[in-house]
Amino acid sequence: HAFLSKAFADVVEIKGLTIRYVEGRMDRDGTLARNLIAAPSLLADNVAAYYEKVVDFKPHLVMTDFDSFAYLFAKRHGLPIVSVDNQQIITRCKHDDDVKQGVKVDYQLTKAFIRAKLPGCDHYVITTFFEPPVRKKFRETTTLVGPILRGEILKAKRTARTGDHVLVYQTSASSKALLDALNEVSDHRFFVYGMRRKDQKSAPLPDRVGNCFIKDFSEEGFVNDLATCQAVVANGGLSLIGEALYLGKPIFSIPVKNQFEQVMNARYLEKLGYGLGSDVIDAQLLKLFLREREKYAARIVKGHREVGNERLYTIVDSLARRFEKKAKKSEKRGLREA
Protein backbone atom coordinates (compact mmCIF):
# COMPACT_ATOMS: atom_id res chain seq x y z
CA HIS A 1 0.00 0.00 0.00
CA ALA A 2 2.77 2.43 0.93
CA PHE A 3 4.60 1.69 -2.32
CA LEU A 4 1.54 2.03 -4.59
CA SER A 5 0.35 5.19 -2.84
CA LYS A 6 3.44 6.98 -4.11
CA ALA A 7 2.35 6.39 -7.71
CA PHE A 8 -1.46 6.41 -7.50
CA ALA A 9 -3.82 8.73 -5.67
CA ASP A 10 -6.70 6.29 -5.10
CA VAL A 11 -5.24 3.24 -3.33
CA VAL A 12 -7.24 1.41 -0.64
CA GLU A 13 -5.32 -0.66 1.90
CA ILE A 14 -6.54 -4.22 2.37
CA LYS A 15 -4.68 -5.90 5.20
CA GLY A 16 -3.46 -9.48 4.95
CA LEU A 17 -1.74 -12.26 6.85
CA THR A 18 1.96 -12.28 7.74
CA ILE A 19 4.76 -14.84 8.16
CA ARG A 20 6.87 -15.10 11.32
CA TYR A 21 10.56 -15.97 11.02
CA VAL A 22 12.89 -17.27 13.75
CA GLU A 23 16.63 -17.66 13.07
CA GLY A 24 16.29 -17.83 9.31
CA ARG A 25 13.41 -20.31 9.40
CA MET A 26 9.68 -19.87 8.88
CA ASP A 27 8.00 -20.51 12.25
CA ARG A 28 4.83 -22.43 11.29
CA ASP A 29 3.27 -22.44 14.77
CA GLY A 30 4.20 -18.81 15.42
CA THR A 31 2.81 -17.77 12.05
CA LEU A 32 -0.49 -19.54 12.76
CA ALA A 33 -0.78 -18.03 16.26
CA ARG A 34 0.04 -14.50 15.10
CA ASN A 35 -2.53 -14.61 12.30
CA LEU A 36 -5.26 -16.09 14.50
CA ILE A 37 -4.76 -13.24 16.97
CA ALA A 38 -4.75 -10.62 14.20
CA ALA A 39 -7.66 -12.06 12.20
CA PRO A 40 -10.58 -10.26 13.97
CA SER A 41 -9.08 -6.79 13.54
CA LEU A 42 -8.02 -7.54 9.96
CA LEU A 43 -11.54 -8.65 9.13
CA ALA A 44 -13.06 -5.52 10.68
CA ASP A 45 -10.68 -3.19 8.82
CA ASN A 46 -11.24 -4.94 5.50
CA VAL A 47 -15.04 -4.95 5.85
CA ALA A 48 -14.91 -1.21 6.54
CA ALA A 49 -12.83 -0.68 3.41
CA TYR A 50 -15.28 -2.87 1.48
CA TYR A 51 -18.27 -0.67 2.35
CA GLU A 52 -16.50 2.69 2.15
CA LYS A 53 -14.46 2.26 -1.02
CA VAL A 54 -14.60 -0.97 -2.96
CA VAL A 55 -18.35 -1.35 -3.61
CA ASP A 56 -18.57 2.16 -5.05
CA PHE A 57 -15.60 1.47 -7.31
CA LYS A 58 -17.69 -0.99 -9.39
CA PRO A 59 -14.87 -2.91 -11.12
CA HIS A 60 -15.37 -4.94 -14.31
CA LEU A 61 -12.39 -7.23 -13.70
CA VAL A 62 -10.58 -8.27 -10.53
CA MET A 63 -6.86 -9.08 -10.41
CA THR A 64 -5.37 -10.65 -7.30
CA ASP A 65 -1.75 -11.12 -6.28
CA PHE A 66 -2.45 -14.10 -4.01
CA ASP A 67 -4.91 -11.98 -1.99
CA SER A 68 -8.05 -13.64 -0.64
CA PHE A 69 -10.07 -10.43 -0.20
CA ALA A 70 -9.98 -9.53 -3.89
CA TYR A 71 -10.71 -13.15 -4.80
CA LEU A 72 -13.74 -13.39 -2.49
CA PHE A 73 -14.99 -10.00 -3.69
CA ALA A 74 -14.94 -11.23 -7.29
CA LYS A 75 -16.64 -14.51 -6.42
CA ARG A 76 -19.30 -12.71 -4.41
CA HIS A 77 -20.22 -10.44 -7.30
CA GLY A 78 -19.75 -12.84 -10.20
CA LEU A 79 -16.87 -10.83 -11.63
CA PRO A 80 -14.12 -12.32 -13.79
CA ILE A 81 -10.96 -12.82 -11.76
CA VAL A 82 -7.36 -13.10 -12.92
CA SER A 83 -4.69 -14.37 -10.55
CA VAL A 84 -1.25 -12.78 -11.07
CA ASP A 85 1.40 -14.21 -8.76
CA ASN A 86 4.39 -16.54 -8.60
CA GLN A 87 3.05 -19.07 -6.08
CA GLN A 88 0.69 -20.83 -8.51
CA ILE A 89 3.66 -22.33 -10.34
CA ILE A 90 3.91 -24.84 -7.49
CA THR A 91 0.50 -26.37 -8.20
CA ARG A 92 -0.09 -25.70 -11.89
CA CYS A 93 3.28 -26.88 -13.23
CA LYS A 94 5.25 -30.12 -13.11
CA HIS A 95 8.51 -30.17 -11.14
CA ASP A 96 11.29 -32.75 -11.32
CA ASP A 97 12.07 -34.87 -8.27
CA ASP A 98 15.37 -33.08 -7.66
CA VAL A 99 13.47 -29.84 -7.01
CA LYS A 100 11.41 -31.53 -4.28
CA GLN A 101 14.12 -33.79 -2.86
CA GLY A 102 14.37 -33.56 0.93
CA VAL A 103 11.51 -31.04 1.20
CA LYS A 104 8.52 -33.10 0.05
CA VAL A 105 6.55 -32.38 3.23
CA ASP A 106 6.95 -28.63 2.70
CA TYR A 107 6.05 -29.12 -0.96
CA GLN A 108 2.82 -30.97 -0.16
CA LEU A 109 1.81 -28.50 2.57
CA THR A 110 2.49 -25.52 0.32
CA LYS A 111 0.66 -27.08 -2.61
CA ALA A 112 -2.42 -27.82 -0.48
CA PHE A 113 -2.47 -24.26 0.87
CA ILE A 114 -2.19 -22.69 -2.59
CA ARG A 115 -4.91 -24.92 -4.04
CA ALA A 116 -7.27 -23.95 -1.23
CA LYS A 117 -6.56 -20.21 -1.36
CA LEU A 118 -7.59 -19.16 -4.89
CA PRO A 119 -9.46 -22.01 -6.61
CA GLY A 120 -11.45 -21.44 -9.78
CA CYS A 121 -10.02 -18.16 -11.09
CA ASP A 122 -10.86 -17.44 -14.72
CA HIS A 123 -7.16 -17.32 -15.57
CA TYR A 124 -3.80 -17.65 -13.82
CA VAL A 125 -0.83 -15.55 -14.92
CA ILE A 126 2.36 -16.80 -13.26
CA THR A 127 5.49 -14.67 -12.99
CA THR A 128 8.67 -16.75 -13.11
CA PHE A 129 12.31 -16.87 -14.22
CA PHE A 130 12.09 -20.59 -15.09
CA GLU A 131 9.64 -22.49 -17.29
CA PRO A 132 8.51 -25.90 -16.06
CA PRO A 133 5.80 -27.58 -18.14
CA VAL A 134 2.24 -26.58 -17.26
CA ARG A 135 0.07 -29.53 -16.23
CA LYS A 136 -2.20 -30.63 -19.07
CA LYS A 137 -5.46 -29.92 -17.22
CA PHE A 138 -4.36 -26.32 -16.52
CA ARG A 139 -2.92 -25.34 -19.91
CA GLU A 140 -5.93 -23.40 -21.19
CA THR A 141 -6.16 -21.28 -18.04
CA THR A 142 -2.46 -20.73 -17.26
CA THR A 143 0.13 -18.38 -18.77
CA LEU A 144 3.77 -18.01 -17.70
CA VAL A 145 5.47 -14.62 -18.02
CA GLY A 146 8.87 -13.29 -16.98
CA PRO A 147 9.38 -11.38 -13.72
CA ILE A 148 7.52 -8.07 -13.38
CA LEU A 149 10.05 -5.32 -12.71
CA ARG A 150 9.72 -1.82 -11.27
CA GLY A 151 10.67 1.17 -13.38
CA GLU A 152 13.80 1.94 -11.37
CA ILE A 153 15.27 -1.46 -12.25
CA LEU A 154 14.42 -1.05 -15.94
CA LYS A 155 16.21 2.32 -15.97
CA ALA A 156 19.22 0.88 -14.12
CA LYS A 157 19.88 -1.53 -17.00
CA ARG A 158 21.38 1.34 -19.02
CA THR A 159 24.10 2.02 -16.45
CA ALA A 160 24.61 -1.49 -15.05
CA ARG A 161 28.23 -2.60 -14.76
CA THR A 162 30.41 -4.98 -12.77
CA GLY A 163 31.88 -3.09 -9.83
CA ASP A 164 34.06 -4.24 -6.93
CA HIS A 165 31.43 -5.17 -4.33
CA VAL A 166 28.94 -7.97 -3.65
CA LEU A 167 25.39 -6.99 -2.68
CA VAL A 168 23.90 -8.90 0.26
CA TYR A 169 20.21 -8.81 1.19
CA GLN A 170 19.22 -11.00 4.12
CA THR A 171 16.51 -10.16 6.65
CA SER A 172 15.87 -13.59 8.14
CA ALA A 173 19.35 -14.94 8.84
CA SER A 174 21.29 -14.45 12.07
CA SER A 175 23.35 -11.31 11.57
CA LYS A 176 26.33 -12.73 13.49
CA ALA A 177 26.46 -15.98 11.50
CA LEU A 178 26.11 -14.14 8.21
CA LEU A 179 28.71 -11.48 8.97
CA ASP A 180 31.16 -14.07 10.31
CA ALA A 181 30.87 -16.07 7.10
CA LEU A 182 31.21 -13.00 4.88
CA ASN A 183 34.32 -11.89 6.76
CA GLU A 184 35.96 -15.23 5.96
CA VAL A 185 35.83 -14.16 2.31
CA SER A 186 38.43 -11.49 2.93
CA ASP A 187 39.18 -10.58 -0.69
CA HIS A 188 35.71 -9.13 -1.35
CA ARG A 189 33.70 -6.16 -0.10
CA PHE A 190 30.07 -6.81 0.86
CA PHE A 191 27.33 -4.16 0.89
CA VAL A 192 24.80 -5.58 3.35
CA TYR A 193 21.12 -4.57 3.33
CA GLY A 194 18.28 -5.77 5.57
CA MET A 195 20.06 -5.85 8.94
CA ARG A 196 18.90 -2.46 10.09
CA ARG A 197 15.15 -2.45 10.65
CA LYS A 198 13.01 0.23 12.23
CA ASP A 199 11.41 -2.29 14.59
CA GLN A 200 14.60 -4.01 15.77
CA LYS A 201 15.05 -4.21 19.54
CA SER A 202 18.79 -4.88 19.65
CA ALA A 203 21.46 -2.21 19.27
CA PRO A 204 22.03 -1.23 15.64
CA LEU A 205 25.08 -2.60 13.88
CA PRO A 206 28.00 -0.25 13.17
CA ASP A 207 28.48 1.05 9.64
CA ARG A 208 31.28 -1.43 9.03
CA VAL A 209 32.02 -4.92 10.35
CA GLY A 210 35.28 -6.15 8.82
CA ASN A 211 34.79 -6.22 5.07
CA CYS A 212 31.00 -5.80 5.42
CA PHE A 213 29.47 -2.35 4.94
CA ILE A 214 26.08 -2.19 6.70
CA LYS A 215 23.64 -0.12 4.66
CA ASP A 216 20.48 1.71 5.66
CA PHE A 217 17.78 1.01 3.10
CA SER A 218 17.04 3.56 0.43
CA GLU A 219 15.52 2.62 -2.91
CA GLU A 220 17.94 4.73 -4.93
CA GLY A 221 21.00 3.45 -3.07
CA PHE A 222 19.88 -0.17 -3.23
CA VAL A 223 19.15 -0.07 -6.97
CA ASN A 224 22.51 1.59 -7.67
CA ASP A 225 24.40 -0.97 -5.56
CA LEU A 226 22.52 -3.80 -7.28
CA ALA A 227 23.25 -2.45 -10.76
CA THR A 228 26.98 -2.10 -10.04
CA CYS A 229 27.70 -5.23 -8.00
CA GLN A 230 29.68 -8.32 -8.97
CA ALA A 231 27.08 -10.73 -7.62
CA VAL A 232 24.17 -11.01 -5.19
CA VAL A 233 23.78 -12.97 -1.94
CA ALA A 234 20.11 -13.21 -0.96
CA ASN A 235 17.30 -15.51 0.13
CA GLY A 236 15.03 -17.25 -2.37
CA GLY A 237 12.42 -14.53 -2.90
CA LEU A 238 11.40 -14.03 -6.53
CA SER A 239 11.44 -10.21 -6.60
CA LEU A 240 15.16 -9.71 -6.00
CA ILE A 241 16.05 -12.80 -8.05
CA GLY A 242 14.15 -11.34 -11.02
CA GLU A 243 15.81 -7.94 -10.62
CA ALA A 244 19.30 -9.40 -10.29
CA LEU A 245 18.91 -11.65 -13.33
CA TYR A 246 17.61 -8.75 -15.45
CA LEU A 247 20.76 -6.81 -14.55
CA GLY A 248 22.95 -9.84 -15.30
CA LYS A 249 24.00 -10.56 -11.72
CA PRO A 250 24.81 -14.12 -10.53
CA ILE A 251 23.02 -15.14 -7.33
CA PHE A 252 24.07 -17.09 -4.25
CA SER A 253 20.70 -18.04 -2.75
CA ILE A 254 20.09 -19.03 0.88
CA PRO A 255 16.35 -19.82 0.97
CA VAL A 256 14.33 -19.40 4.15
CA LYS A 257 13.86 -22.83 5.73
CA ASN A 258 10.35 -24.34 5.63
CA GLN A 259 9.37 -22.09 2.70
CA PHE A 260 9.18 -24.40 -0.29
CA GLU A 261 8.78 -21.60 -2.82
CA GLN A 262 12.16 -20.14 -1.85
CA VAL A 263 13.85 -23.56 -1.88
CA MET A 264 12.36 -24.20 -5.32
CA ASN A 265 13.67 -20.89 -6.66
CA ALA A 266 17.18 -21.60 -5.35
CA ARG A 267 17.21 -25.04 -6.95
CA TYR A 268 16.06 -23.73 -10.32
CA LEU A 269 18.80 -21.08 -10.15
CA GLU A 270 21.32 -23.91 -9.90
CA LYS A 271 19.64 -26.03 -12.59
CA LEU A 272 19.77 -23.13 -15.03
CA GLY A 273 23.37 -22.26 -14.18
CA TYR A 274 22.54 -18.77 -12.88
CA GLY A 275 24.17 -19.27 -9.48
CA LEU A 276 24.30 -21.54 -6.44
CA GLY A 277 21.88 -22.41 -3.65
CA SER A 278 22.75 -23.38 -0.09
CA ASP A 279 20.77 -24.25 3.02
CA VAL A 280 23.19 -22.19 5.12
CA ILE A 281 25.64 -19.36 4.58
CA ASP A 282 28.80 -21.35 3.94
CA ALA A 283 32.02 -19.38 3.42
CA GLN A 284 33.78 -22.04 1.34
CA LEU A 285 30.82 -22.46 -1.00
CA LEU A 286 30.51 -18.68 -1.29
CA LYS A 287 34.20 -18.48 -2.26
CA LEU A 288 33.59 -21.09 -4.97
CA PHE A 289 30.57 -19.16 -6.23
CA LEU A 290 32.51 -15.90 -6.44
CA ARG A 291 35.42 -17.55 -8.25
CA GLU A 292 33.00 -18.83 -10.88
CA ARG A 293 30.73 -15.78 -11.05
CA GLU A 294 31.73 -14.96 -14.64
CA LYS A 295 30.53 -18.40 -15.73
CA TYR A 296 27.14 -17.79 -14.10
CA ALA A 297 26.92 -14.29 -15.58
CA ALA A 298 27.51 -15.70 -19.07
CA ARG A 299 24.72 -18.24 -18.55
CA ILE A 300 22.34 -15.47 -17.49
CA VAL A 301 23.10 -13.44 -20.61
CA LYS A 302 22.57 -16.52 -22.77
CA GLY A 303 19.54 -18.06 -21.12
CA HIS A 304 17.49 -15.63 -19.04
CA ARG A 305 14.09 -14.80 -20.52
CA GLU A 306 12.92 -11.25 -21.07
CA VAL A 307 11.16 -9.09 -18.50
CA GLY A 308 7.44 -9.86 -18.25
CA ASN A 309 5.97 -6.34 -18.00
CA GLU A 310 4.88 -5.79 -21.61
CA ARG A 311 3.67 -9.36 -22.05
CA LEU A 312 1.61 -9.06 -18.87
CA TYR A 313 -0.07 -5.87 -20.14
CA THR A 314 -0.93 -7.59 -23.43
CA ILE A 315 -2.32 -10.66 -21.68
CA VAL A 316 -4.44 -8.62 -19.27
CA ASP A 317 -5.91 -6.58 -22.15
CA SER A 318 -6.72 -9.80 -24.00
CA LEU A 319 -8.31 -11.39 -20.92
CA ALA A 320 -10.38 -8.27 -20.22
CA ARG A 321 -11.85 -8.48 -23.72
CA ARG A 322 -12.43 -12.22 -23.38
CA PHE A 323 -14.28 -11.84 -20.08
CA GLU A 324 -16.24 -8.73 -21.09
CA LYS A 325 -19.50 -10.66 -21.37
CA LYS A 326 -19.19 -12.00 -17.82
CA ALA A 327 -18.38 -8.51 -16.53
CA LYS A 328 -21.46 -7.04 -18.20
CA LYS A 329 -23.69 -9.68 -16.60
CA SER A 330 -22.35 -8.72 -13.19
CA GLU A 331 -22.86 -5.03 -13.95
CA LYS A 332 -26.51 -5.61 -14.86
CA ARG A 333 -27.12 -7.41 -11.57
CA GLY A 334 -25.37 -4.65 -9.64
CA LEU A 335 -22.85 -5.17 -6.86
CA ARG A 336 -24.29 -6.68 -3.73
CA GLU A 337 -24.08 -4.82 -0.47
CA ALA A 338 -22.67 -7.72 1.53
Please annotate each region the language model reported.
Residues 77-144:
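Active-site-proximal region of nucleotide-activated glycan assembly enzymes
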Residues 1-41:
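Conserved nucleotide-sugar phosphate-binding/catalytic loop shared by glycosyltransferases and other
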Residues 61-65, 224-264:
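A donor-sugar binding/catalytic signature common to diverse glycosyltransferases
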Residues 13-14, 213-217, 275-283:
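Short acidic-hydrophobic, aromatic-tinged amphipathic segments that line or gate anion-handling sites
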Residues 287-338:
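C-terminal amphipathic helix plus adjacent low-complexity
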